[in-house]
C-alpha cells in the first residue's frame, strides 16, 4: 500500500499525495536504482548489411524465395465443428456417378456377389477355402476381361468393315465420274468433227 503524505505550507490544504511504496522505502529505492535498464530482446535479429547485400544479389540471380504457403481450413479439408463424424465411413472423392451393368450380365453379378463382403465381413475360413474363393473370383475377372477384349475386337472389325465399304463406294463413284467425263469428252469431240465437215448443196 502507498503511504499518504500531507502537504505542509503556509495555509494547510486538504490535498493528499499518494506516493508508491517503492519510492517511500529506502531499501526498495536502492534496489530499483541498481537494476540495469534492460529491454526485451526482439525475437528476430536485425539483418547485417553484408547479409542483406548477399540476399539481394541472390534474389537478382535466382529470383525471390517463395513464401511459405498458408492453407485455410477449406484447403486442408478439416471437418467442420458441431458435425458428427461417423467412424470408419470415408466419403469418396473424385469421380461421382454409378456404373450400371446389364440385367443379364451374370459374370459381373457373380463377381460382385463374391467380392462385396470381403472387406467388411469377418469371414472365418481356412486357407484352402480362401484360396478356392479367391481362385473363383480371379476366374470370373479373367472371363470379364476376355469378354471386354472380344467386344473391343468386334467393334474394331465393324469399324474396319465400315471404312472398307466407304472406301469401295468412294472408289466406285470416282470410276463412274471418270467414265462420265470420258463420255462427255468423246461426245464433244464428235460434235466438233461433224461441224468441221463441209456440206455441199447442189442447186
Swiss-Prot record:
Record's compositionally biased regions (Basic residues): 166-178, 194-203
Biased amino acid composition, Polar residues: 27-39
Signal peptide per UniProt: none
Subcellular location: Nucleus, Nucleolus
Transmembrane segments: none
Composition skew (Basic and acidic residues), residue ranges: 68-77, 147-165
Highest taxon listed in the record's lineage: Eukaryota
Predominant cellular place of this UniProt entry's protein: nucleus
InterPro entries to which the protein is assigned, alphabetical: Loc1
Keywords: Coiled coil, mRNA transport, Nucleus, Ribosome biogenesis, Transport
Protein family according to the UniProt entry: Belongs to the LOC1 family.
Protein name: 60S ribosomal subunit assembly/export protein LOC1
Classification of source organism: Eukaryota, Fungi, Dikarya, Ascomycota, Saccharomycotina
Amino acid at each position: 500500500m502507498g503511504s499518504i503524505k500531507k502537504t505542509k505550507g503556509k495555509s494547510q490544504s486538504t490535498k493528499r499525495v499518494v506516493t508508491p511504496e517503492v519510492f517511500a522505502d529506502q531499501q526498495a529505492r536502492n534496489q530499483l536504482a541498481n537494476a540495469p535498464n534492460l529491454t526485451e530482446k526482439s525475437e528476430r535479429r536485425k539483418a547485417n548489411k553484408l547479409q542483406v547485400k548477399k540476399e539481394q544479389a541472390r534474389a537478382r540471380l535466382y529470383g525471390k524465395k517463395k513464401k511459405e504457403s498458408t492453407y485455410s481450413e477449406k484447403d486442408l479439408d478439416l471437418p467442420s465443428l458441431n458435425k458428427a463424424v461417423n467412424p470408419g465411413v470415408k466419403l469418396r472423392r473424385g469421380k461421382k456417378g454409378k456404373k450400371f451393368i446389364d440385367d443379364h450380365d451374370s459374370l459381373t453379378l457373380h463377381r460382385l456377389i463374391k467380392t462385396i463382403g470381403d472387406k467388411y465381413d469377418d469371414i472365418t475360413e481356412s486357407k484352402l477355402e480362401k484360396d478356392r474363393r479367391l481362385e473363383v473370383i480371379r476366374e470370373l475377372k479373367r472371363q470379364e476381361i476376355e469378354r471386354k477384349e472380344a467386344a473391343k475386337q468386334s467393334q474394331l472389325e465393324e469399324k474396319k468393315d465400315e471404312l472398307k465399304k466407304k472406301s469401295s463406294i468412294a472408289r466406285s463413284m470416282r470410276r463412274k465420274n471418270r467414265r462420265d467425263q470420258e463420255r462427255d469428252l468423246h461426245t464433244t469431240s464428235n460434235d466438233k468433227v461433224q461441224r468441221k465437215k463441209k456440206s455441199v448443196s447442189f442447186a
